[in-house]
From Swiss-Prot:
Thylakoid recorded as keyword: no
Span of the signal peptide: none
Functional note: Component of the core of the flagella.
Molecular-function GO terms, alphabetical: structural molecule activity
Alphabetical list of InterPro entries matching this protein: Flagellin, Flagellin_C, Flagellin_C_sub2, Flagellin_N
Protein name: Flagellin FlaB1
Subcellular location: Periplasmic flagellum; Periplasm
């Protein structure tokens, strides 16, 4: 028997200290819900988890971007619907004016309505905006000649660099549609039967241009809607994977915490017992 070093007490103290650390970690995990709260808990797991979190947040933002893109396209298409309706009405008037039963005075009255409708086409083009950006005045159109790109709208629809989509919207002013002269600003004339007849072809070309643009917008919108679904699924799956790495299994952690609490209580009792065992040596010295 020795009295200078109480090995039992030293062992009990060391074990109790380790158990107390584990109890503290258990409280931390149970209160936060995370298995990994700092790099020391799992260095590689933390690194992987943080990379996944970056991707998840990027995917969620990209989904929002794509949804904004759908809204952008829907607003543009709504303005083009108005322009289409106006052009259809102008076409009706041109066909009416091309009929030989009308006098010059009659055609002048028809021309008044046509002039007002053409002015409305320009008003729509100038007032069609999304977040302060003009949509139909050529800001997002291709520049003709030598296949040079003039402008476009970019939508970032991915979590990483260069994962984006380009959208083009042509110029839809009266000049671009051919119903107003770009030099002298004169409006397409239907004051004679022949001029009204020629105007029908001009309007058909304008409607073809508008319909082509609307078809393009429909394609853009469908793509973006599928993109939103894909991004949401990707974010959901990646979140599940990240959760398996970082989140705590509460049932498992509770079992571990309860075990460590019992060990703490028993360790405390055994440390007290080990400290008192040395006193039994005094009976030998009496």
């Amino acid at each position: 028997m020795i009295i200078n070093h109480n090995m039992s007490a030293m062992f009990a103290q060391r074990t109790l200290g380790h158990t107390n650390v584990q109890v503290g970690k258990g409280i931390e995990k149970l209160s936060s819900g995370y298995r990994i709260n700092r790099a020391g808990d799992d260095a590689s797991g933390l690194a992987v988890s943080e990379k996944m979190r970056s991707q998840i947040r990027g995917l969620n933002q990209a989904s929002t971007n794509a949804s904004n893109g759908v809204n952008f396209i829907q607003v543009t298409e709504a303005y083009l619907q108005e322009t289409t309706d106006i052009m259809q009405r102008i076409r009706e008037l041109a066909i009416q004016a091309a009929n030989g039963i009308y006098s010059a005075e009659d055609r002048m009255q028809i021309q008044v309505e046509v002039s007002q409708l053409v002015a409305e086409v320009d008003r729509i083009a100038s007032s069609a905006q999304f977040n302060g950006m003009n949509l139909l005045t050529g800001r997002f159109s291709r520049t003709e000649g030598e296949n040079v790109i003039g402008g476009s709208m970019w939508f970032h629809i991915g979590a990483n660099m260069d994962q984006r989509m380009r959208v083009y919207i042509g110029t839809m002013t009266a000049v671009a549609l051919g119903v107003r002269n770009g030099v002298d600003e004169s409006i397409m004339s239907i004051e004679t039967a022949d001029s009204a007849n020629k105007s029908i072809g001009t309007i058909d070309a304008a409607l073809k241009r508008i319909n082509k643009q609307r078809a393009d917008l429909g394609g853009y919108q469908n793509r973006m809607e599928y993109t939103v679904v894909g991004l949401d699924i990707a974010a959901e799956n990646l979140q599940a994977a990240e959760s398996r790495i970082r989140d705590a299994n509460i049932a498992k952690q509770m079992v571990e915490y309860t075990k460590n609490q019992v060990l703490t209580q028993s360790g405390t009792a055994m440390l007290a017992q080990a400290n008192t065992s040395a006193q039994s040596i005094l009976s030998i010295l009496r």
